[in-house]
Amino acid sequence: MNYTKQDPELWSAIEREEKRQQHNIELIASENIVSDSVRKAQGSVLTNKYAEGYPGKRYYGGCEFIDQVEQLAIDRAKAIFNAEYVNVQPHSGSQANAAAYAAFIKPGDKILGMDLNAGGHLTHGAKVSFSGTFYQSVSYGVDPQTEKLDYDEIRRIALKEQPQIIVAGASAYSRFIDWNKFREIADEVGAYLMVDMAHIAGLVAAGLHPSPVGIADVVTTTTHKTLRGPRGGMILSQEKYAKQLNFAVFPQNQGGPLEHVIAAKAVAFGEALQPEFKTYQKQVLKNAKAMAEVFENDTILHVVTGGTDNHLMTVDLTGTQLNGKEVQNLLDGVFITTNKEAIPEEKLSPFKTSGIRIGTPAITTRGFKEDDCREVANLIIRAIKNADNETVLEEIKRDVFKLTEKYPID
């Protein structure tokens, strides 16, 4: 069947997106480029199969091979993270978080999570999210001077608010997080500790960031981002919580699992168990540090916290005449993809923001090294300082094209 002739409108859009990915420098910290094997598994005949339940306990017949696939994903994830319990069925990180809350607390209970402006995620208690609608939510931020987590202040808030669950983890925080300090605070107030490691899961898998598994009561993650798998979620915990977590995923929050996506997760987990994966993650860190140094050394830009310990950074734009949305659009115009991001003590709306978030997982997958990343950072600075100079912007486009031609997506 010729799909392009059967549905040209759809396939034209897909082809244009493929070209965009090929010719743009992708710096969105939550995006990556999966292997052909991951894509093939996700596009397999497993998409045809319903499989409500869990391996060995399905509500439908004909699941014997589906069980093998899902068990492979579970076993590989357990091996990667040294986890007693793994659930690979969550459709997304948000679904994993919803299930984790449902397993440990009840509607109306209190969540203590990281404030959005400090780098937290919507599902950590933001009022516009289910986590701030079905539950009471309070937040902690970062120290205004250092822009880093202040564990004494988090403890003070926890003692005052007495939450039922404390959420550690972030979507835009560039420093190591001390899981043990969060554990101590949670124990002191009698709260469960939940860690959302969606952004850093690949670094944790490679042993390059401290692991929360075995410290937190429950750990959630996405399977894309640094883990370089398909878009999806996962929950890790202790065996003693298996029954309540399984129930919270199915039937409480989801129906049939996406077994074609779970197969792709199994592929990605297999890749993460290979020595090359650690080499890749080390380069992700080197590239991020190289970019952060360029931005921090510039006269009008500032990297929140002054640098990075992981794959991302938030660049503070308050020293420029542009906001985050304007810089995002400006960089889109020169084929560099970023996203607007709030900074600590943010004064602008979430639709404008005072910063941009930058990450290195996708460009590292393409093969970029430190010098390439320094060049990209300098191109970004040049674009910001020449936002109205079409001649300079055209030169930047040509330089971007040279880099993407040098490192094509396989």
From Swiss-Prot:
One of its GO terms (molecular function) is pyridoxal phosphate binding. This is Serine hydroxymethyltransferase. It comes from the Bacteria. Pfam families: SHMT. PANTHER family: SERINE HYDROXYMETHYLTRANSFERASE (PTHR11680), SERINE HYDROXYMETHYLTRANSFERASE 1 (PTHR11680:SF35). The keyword Phosphoprotein does not apply. Homodimer. It comes from Pediococcus pentosaceus (strain ATCC 25745 / CCUG 21536 / LMG 10740 / 183-1w).
